[in-house]
């Protein structure tokens, strides 16, 4: 929502409101200053889920813009590897969380005992989110584990690619999913919704991505949609996009002969 507001043409009345703080999940760091300068609003982010609570928050003093912040009082969080061993600072892993109060989290999934045991194993709730904890203790979201992309030996965050695409002035929304590569692993497929009246070409998007993303993370495929499939609470239904995959209407960077600069 923040990137949509920032892309709107300036309005002399845009600061005539009583809002001072706004919750802005998944907002890139540069937009924090844009929101403050244009609208006089301080943005706050964090991490929570239906099963848990607000475990991380940038309301913790000193948290950098674009991060998920630090651990809120009454909770604990860490980053672990596939063996549930704590990952070194700066290396990605799964976010696991727990609470000091036994009733601050849900007690499990109704009539799904196996799923409950899997999620709450080793006395930590396993979130399914891939994050990094930096040297200062701040948490940074990387991707959903199930949405991570592996291309030619490189790990790619769909979240990072989506943030760059969404920053394009002609893009209203974007979602990125992996599709099978001919030589194994994945290729990057981007679904893009343009702003009303805008008609960016796939080449325009490539040129915009090149100085902002590692070359291996730049989408090979681009598909323009009128809208993204969403759940009732507004989350992108990526499984539907993965099922759709590459279609006849999908632009292919390699077939188009677009050469990336390195």
PLM features per residue range, with description:
Residues 56-59, 68-69, 88-90, 107-109:
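Active-site glycine/GP-rich loop and adjacent strand/helix microenvironment
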Residues 3-65, 76, 83-86:
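Gly/Ser/Thr-rich phosphate-binding loop
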Residues 18, 40, 74, 170-173, ...:
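Glycine-centered tight turns that cap/initiate beta-strands
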Residues 66-71, 119-123:
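Short Gly/Pro-enriched turn/cap motifs at secondary-structure boundaries
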Residues 77, 83-84, 94-103, 107-108, ...:
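AMP-binding/adenylate-forming catalytic core of the ANL superfamily
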């Amino acid at each position: 929502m923040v990137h949509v507001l920032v892309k709107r043409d300036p309005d002399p009345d845009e600061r005539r409101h009583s809002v001072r703080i706004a919750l802005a999940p998944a907002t890139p760091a540069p937009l924090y200053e844009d929101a403050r300068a244009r609208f006089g609003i301080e943005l706050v982010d964090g991490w929570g889920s239906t099963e848990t609570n607000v475990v991380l928050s940038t309301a913790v003093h000193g948290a950098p813009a674009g991060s998920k912040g630090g651990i809120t009082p009454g909770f604990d969080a860490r980053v672990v590897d596939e063996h549930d061993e704590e990952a070194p600072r700066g290396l990605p892993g799964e976010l696991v969380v727990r609470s000091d109060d036994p009733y601050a989290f849900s007690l499990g999934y109704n009539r799904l005992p196996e799923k409950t045991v899997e999620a709450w194993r080793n006395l930590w709730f396993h979130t399914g989110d891939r994050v990094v904890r930096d040297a200062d203790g701040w948490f940074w979201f990387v991707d959903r584990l199930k949405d991570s992309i592996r291309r030619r030996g490189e790990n790619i965050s769909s979240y990072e690619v989506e943030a760059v695409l969404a920053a394009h002035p002609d893009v209203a929304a974007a979602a990125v999913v992996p599709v099978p590569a001919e030589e194994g692993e994945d290729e990057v497929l981007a679904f893009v919704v343009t702003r009303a009246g805008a008609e960016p070409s796939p080449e325009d998007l490539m040129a915009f991505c090149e100085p902002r993303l590692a070359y291996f993370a730049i989408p090979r495929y681009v598909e323009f949609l009128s809208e993204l499939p969403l759940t009732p609470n507004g989350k992108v239904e990526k499984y539907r996009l993965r099922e759709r995959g590459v279609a006849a209407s999908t632009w292919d960077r390699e077939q188009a002969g677009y050469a990336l600069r390195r």
